[in-house]
UniProtKB/Swiss-Prot annotation:
<comment type="similarity">
    <text>Belongs to the archaeal NMN adenylyltransferase family.</text>
</comment>
<keyword id="KW-0547">Nucleotide-binding</keyword>
<dbReference type="GO" id="GO:0000309">
    <property type="term" value="F:nicotinamide-nucleotide adenylyltransferase activity"/>
</dbReference>
<dbReference type="InterPro" id="IPR004821">
    <property type="entry name" value="Cyt_trans-like"/>
</dbReference>
<dbReference type="GO" id="GO:0009435">
    <property type="term" value="P:NAD biosynthetic process"/>
</dbReference>
<keyword id="KW-0520">NAD</keyword>
<keyword id="KW-0662">Pyridine nucleotide biosynthesis</keyword>
<keyword id="KW-0808">Transferase</keyword>
<dbReference type="GO" id="GO:0005737">
    <property type="term" value="C:cytoplasm"/>
</dbReference>
<comment type="pathway">
    <text>Cofactor biosynthesis; NAD(+) biosynthesis; NAD(+) from nicotinamide D-ribonucleotide: step 1/1.</text>
</comment>
<keyword id="KW-0548">Nucleotidyltransferase</keyword>
<keyword id="KW-0067">ATP-binding</keyword>
<protein>
    <recommendedName>
        <fullName>Nicotinamide-nucleotide adenylyltransferase</fullName>
        <ecNumber>2.7.7.1</ecNumber>
    </recommendedName>
</protein>
<dbReference type="InterPro" id="IPR006418">
    <property type="entry name" value="NMN_Atrans_arc"/>
</dbReference>
<dbReference type="InterPro" id="IPR014729">
    <property type="entry name" value="Rossmann-like_a/b/a_fold"/>
</dbReference>
<dbReference type="GO" id="GO:0005524">
    <property type="term" value="F:ATP binding"/>
</dbReference>
<keyword id="KW-0963">Cytoplasm</keyword>
Length: 171
């Protein structure tokens, strides 16, 4: 059985890894959709699809997990979004998502939809991790070591800090 899991992975963290490890015990292959792949260089979505792909693939090299990582665009036309996903991915029968809109869209197309149990959401939240990066708090323990290396390689912390700068001093 092949399943589809979509996320923004901004950044890929240990909570994401635990969800993928758990799903991998239930299915033969996982299609990891890199959602909102067209978005980058914002405080909410600081990393490019390629950078997120590196985070995921370098991390999962250490695990016996069969997967495809595929960039998925937002198309802002919900009625045809599932068809767009289907055109970009290998066939799948099950969708794992915690997003109510994604759950609804795939349910309407008769997919089996499962809500994965979040892993320690108090600590493992992309929003909280990005905030820690911005304010100089320790964040490295919340992501796999390979993700730390990717973020260092692309100077991701300084990118986030530059994105947070005001364009002009307020008088």
């Amino acid at each position: 059985m092949r399943a589809f899991l979509i996320g923004r992975w901004q950044p890929f963290h240990k909570g994401h890894l635990e969800i993928i490890k758990k799903i991998s015990k239930e299915v033969d292959e996982i299609i990891i959709g890199i959602g909102s792949c067209q978005k980058s260089h914002t405080l909410t979505d600081p990393f490019t699809a390629g950078e997120r792909m590196m985070m995921i693939t370098k991390t999962l090299e250490n695990y016996d997990i069969n997967y495809y990582a595929i960039p998925i665009n937002d198309i802002d036309y919900n009625a045809v979004w599932v068809s767009s996903v289907e055109s970009l991915t290998p066939p799948f029968t099950t969708v794992y998502t915690g997003n109510s809109l994604v759950r609804e869209l795939f349910s309407e197309k008769n997919y089996a939809v499962k809500k994965p149990e979040l892993y320690n959401r108090t600590d493992y939240s992309g929003t909280k991790i990005r905030k820690k990066m911005l304010d100089g708090s320790t964040w490295e323990h919340l992501v796999p070591e390979e993700v730390v290396k990717v973020i260092e390689e692309i100077d991701g912390i300084n990118r986030i800090r530059r994105l947070n700068e005001k364009d002009y001093d307020e008088e």
